């Protein structure tokens, strides 16, 4: 599942640069911005049949690929 999440991040961001360091801050590095973050949420929700309300997503809680993968897994486990 992690690999699928990383593929989605790559598609939305247009780069695989984050794969070199899965704890890289995607916002600080300019890989994600607010618009791409919303696009990422929509893609993840569709791919994994989960709900990721932006109001529950503080930037610090999902600013790295590893944190995004953990959050998606957490939401999948809730279902």
Curated annotation (Swiss-Prot):
> Which Pfam families does this chain map to?
PP-binding (PF00550)
The answer, when asked if Membrane is one of the entry's keywords, is no
What are the protein's UniProt keywords?
Answer: Cell wall biogenesis/degradation, Cytoplasm, Phosphopantetheine, Phosphoprotein
Instruction: Indicate where this protein resides in the cell.
Output: Cytoplasm
Known function? Carrier protein involved in the D-alanylation of lipoteichoic acid (LTA). The loading of thioester-linked D-alanine onto DltC is catalyzed by D-alanine--D-alanyl carrier protein ligase DltA. The DltC-carried D-alanyl group is further transferred to cell membrane phosphatidylglycerol (PG) by forming an ester bond, probably catalyzed by DltD. D-alanylation of LTA plays an important role in modulating the properties of the cell wall in Gram-positive bacteria, influencing the net charge of the cell wall.
By its UniProt entry, which SUPFAM superfamilies does this protein fall under? ACP-like
Species annotation: Lactococcus lactis subsp. lactis (strain IL1403) (Streptococcus lactis)
Q: Where is the Carrier domain?
A: 1-76
Write down any Gene Ontology CC term.
cytoplasm
Q: List the Gene Ontology MF annotations in alphabetical order.
A: D-alanyl carrier activity
Protein's name according to its UniProt entry: D-alanyl carrier protein
| Pathway listed | Cell wall biogenesis; lipoteichoic acid biosynthesis
| Top-level taxon of the source organism | Bacteria
Q: Which GO terms describe its biological process?
A: cell wall organization; lipoteichoic acid biosynthetic process
What the entry lists under InterPro entries is as follows: ACP-like_sf, DltC, PP-bd_ACP
Q: For this UniProt entry, what is the primary localization, expressed as one broad class? A: cytoplasm
Task: Give the record's family classification.
Answer: Belongs to the DltC family.
- Residues with the modification O-(pantetheine 4'-phosphoryl)serine, per the entry, are 34
- Cite the post-translational modification comment: 4'-phosphopantetheine is transferred from CoA to a specific serine of apo-DCP.
